[in-house]
Amino acid sequence: MNFSITPIGYLETPFEAVNNMPIQPSVVASSEGKAVLYHEFAAGLKDLDGFSHIILLFLLHKIEGYQLEVVPFMDDVPHGIFATRSPKRPNRIGMSIVRLERIEDNIIYFKGVDMLNGSPLLDIKPYYSYFDNREDVRNGWLEGKVLPPERLKSDNRFNNK
C-alpha cells in the first residue's frame, strides 16, 4: 500500500546541513526555531498555546535512502534502524519534543532545535505528561550512555552517498 502525506507547513531553523547539527533537542535547549503553518491549517492551533511542550513530526528532507543497520551517533557498533533515532529511516520521519514559546498567527516559536531549515512539517501534537511520561523504562543499548553536549552533534556518517 502506498500513500501520500501533505505537509501542513515547514520549519525555520538555523541549521542548513546535516553535519554538526544537534542530534536531540535537549542538546540545544536554548536554540530557537519556528514552525510556519500554511494558512489553511492555522485554525488548528487553537488552544495549543496552553501547553509548554509540543511534539513536531517532520520529514528528514535532506536524507536519501535508508539503512536497516546503522552505527548510531551514541555508539560504535551497528544496531537495527528501529532501535535507534538515526535519520536514515525507510520513511524519513523525524520527531522532536520542543518547548513552545509563543504562537503568533500561523507561526509557532519554539526552543530546542534539532531539525534542518526548510524541513516539511507533517504534524503537531501537544506533549501531555500524563500520557507521554513513562515509569519503569528500559533503555536498551542506550542504558548508561551519556555523552557531553559537544559530542551530541551529527557527523558525516548519514550523508547522502
Q: Model-predicted segments: where are they?
A:
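Cys-His-centered catalytic/binding microenvironment captured across papain-like cysteine peptidases
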Residues: 1-95, 102-161
